[in-house]
């Protein structure tokens, strides 16, 4: 095993080959799930992927198609209500 693969920043995937041997394939770990910028709640609709994988996805698959995709729906509603109330007053 190469010294670079000894660290746990590489995920170890055990793969059975057609010859019946089990070998280790090393993969980079997936990044953490995206979180809301205000409350920190995990965001739905945003895939966990390394930059190389994310680059291959179309823009609509990378983030929600709505205003303020970096916020969860609850926080987005709060912000929009505050903005509208500020305009009215």
From Swiss-Prot:
Xref: HAMAP family: Ribosomal_eL34
GO molecular function: structural constituent of ribosome
Protein name, entry field: Large ribosomal subunit protein eL34
InterPro entries associated with the record: Ribosomal_eL34, Ribosomal_eL34_C_sf, Ribosomal_eL34_CS, Ribosomal_L34e_arc-type
Subunit architecture: Part of the 50S ribosomal subunit.
Organism placement in taxonomy: Archaea, Methanobacteriati, Methanobacteriota, Thermococci, Thermococcales
Similarity comment: Belongs to the eukaryotic ribosomal protein eL34 family.
Pfam families: Ribosomal_L34e
Cysteine disulfide links: none
GO terms under cellular component: ribonucleoprotein complex; ribosome
Record organism: Pyrococcus furiosus (strain ATCC 43587 / DSM 3638 / JCM 8422 / Vc1)
GO BP: translation
Listed NCBIfam families: PRK04059.1 (NF003143)
Domain of life: Archaea
This protein's UniProt keywords: Ribonucleoprotein, Ribosomal protein
Chain positions covered by the region annotation Disordered: 45-71
